[in-house]
């Protein structure tokens, strides 16, 4: 009986790393996530520490250390957490000359400091510096092995409350899909849906076959065109620069409604337009008109990580932290290779149309599921090193990482601090450019993570993205595609 209790206790206190978490812990693919939260009020360190003690540290991953004994697989081992050891409050001159630059430099420096393996792999930096966007900052640094971006963002939101209602959790938009006939459909309608279903399956199989072929070619021979955005060898070791811009979510939704598309379609269209503007200017500066003329022949792709585990949801995570109950968690993802169309368009709306066509095709493919299964097979048969080589090869052969994270519909408060914006980013992977779009209330935060040796002007990249949205919005209004609701 005593042995049974001991075994049960060890099962609860120890858990092996998932294959994806092992990948993120490998020396050649050591990734971490940084979430910058800009507060509307001055920072209150004791209030944040008290809040973390009752929320974040109750999550098993945030109260476990990574144990890597020789001869054994890495495991998560529960430990007692002293929150004060994870909260860092640097001395900042309140009259600092350029606070915005100080914030950028501080976050960039965080990419050079490895995580302390003797503690749970997270830390929070509290900066009492007033910038053009916030009165103070909380910067959360999390090792990527703790979870995927969507899960970690949901967990962070579960630690917050609505500013308008301090007892209520944030609400996040959920896109509900409906496919197939209703129960009351007629006979001919059901026959029609049968043919639609068969066509869907055939298209799914064909697209998956093509994507698997392109994925295999990317691993062995196919690489993106050499451009001013493509990473150099060792780019993952270079301290990154993090810059952001805040745009209106209403502008994005205006384009979305006018063109009957999704928010993701619009943001990818904005990205295509922004990258085209940036590359066009670069080629002009380098006086290589031939390169500019051949922009449409450029192969430029993004390796996008797709979470294959159903999100636990903010309510479930909040309940787990409050009651210390269990909840599904972990890294389970696959990759898709998303091509971008690069070139200066006379019609700005063409960027969005092209983006929608590309995304719609990718939605009818099992590329992400295949890539995840292939990675797990390589890990099982050839080991971790071979898996890391595989993933690095895919990323090295593409140009950028891209993500769009859905945030709360309303403004939120983080342990007594109403937030003006949230800006996530990731580093440690061998891309010179990573783009994140984060929605928050009526805003969209564009975050650019750049290797300064490849992209020395990330602020201009941000400006190009902002100007691209303005250009697309102006085209919508000029053509009267959007009707103002009364």
UniProtKB/Swiss-Prot annotation:
A GO term for molecular function: diacylglycerol O-acyltransferase activity
Chief location category: membrane
Active site annotation, chain numbering: 144 (proton acceptor)
Transmembrane segments: 193-213
Compartment list: Cell membrane; Endoplasmic reticulum membrane
Effect after changing residue 274 to R: In fop1-1; disturbed petal development due to stuck petals in the bud during elongation, and resulting in the formation of folded petals in the open flower
GO biological process: one example: triglyceride biosynthetic process
Knockout or disruption consequences: Disturbed petal development during their growth through the narrow space between sepals and anthers, leading to stuck petals in the bud during elongation, and resulting in the formation of folded petals in the open flower. Flattened conical-shaped petal epidermal cells associated with abnormal contacts of petals with the sepal surface.
Keyword Transferase annotated: yes
Annotated SUPFAM superfamilies: CoA-dependent acyltransferases (SSF52777)
InterPro entries: CAT-like_dom_sf, O-acyltransferase_WSD1-like, O-acyltransferase_WSD1_C, O-acyltransferase_WSD1_N
Pfam families listed in its UniProt record: WS_DGAT_C, WS_DGAT_cat
EC number of this enzyme: 2.3.1.20, 2.3.1.75
Pathway(s) this gene product operates in, as recorded in its UniProt entry: Glycerolipid metabolism; triacylglycerol biosynthesis; Lipid metabolism
Cytoplasmic face of the membrane: 1-192
Extracellular topological domain residue ranges: 214-486
Reactions this protein catalyses: an acyl-CoA + a 1,2-diacyl-sn-glycerol = a triacyl-sn-glycerol + CoA; a long chain fatty alcohol + a fatty acyl-CoA = a wax ester + CoA
Family the UniProt entry places it in: In the N-terminal section; belongs to the long-chain O-acyltransferase family.
The protein's role, per its UniProt record: Bifunctional wax ester synthase/diacylglycerol acyltransferase. Involved in cuticular wax biosynthesis. Required for petals development, probably by mediating the production of fatty acids at the plasma membrane in the petal epidermis acting as lubricants that makes petal elongation smooth in narrow space between the sepals and the anthers inside floral buds.
Protein name, UniProt field: Wax ester synthase/diacylglycerol acyltransferase 11
